Amino acid sequence: HILDYLQQKDIPIKNQKLDTGDYGCMIPKNEEFGIPRAIYLDSRVERKAHMDEITGNLQKDTQTAFENELIRSKDIPFTLLVEDLHGYEKMLQGKYRSKYNPFALLGRLNTFKAKYNFEIVYVDKKFTGNWIYHHFYYQVKHYLRAGIL
């Protein structure tokens, strides 16, 4: 659904493995605009389909891989995107398959946010592609205007 959105909007896509996150941004080489080589933005989005995926990532046998992902991304803008507009509410109410205590989960995620400097957003799945595109679009716009890129 994310690639469908980007393709419908004629947004160029480059599939490649990232060291961290599921989505990144690349400004292609365009000498006409003074971009002599492709520029890769140091920013990532990690997509989770629902709260069950997050609680699954925090189980004893999987939490190390999840935390390692956060460690690799702690020095760049990083967002954990949950495709559930009501994900925060579901977390507080314990509406997920895991037996994870809701307040322990809230505490764990907020501790990780503070420790690894990332944010969590909850978005309706039908808007995920739109959110990801505009997230990177406005970062790039800011960085170009500020002369950072």
Enumerate the language-model features and the residues they cover.
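Conserved catalytic cores of phosphodiester-cleaving nucleases, focusing on short active-site segments
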Residues: S43-A49
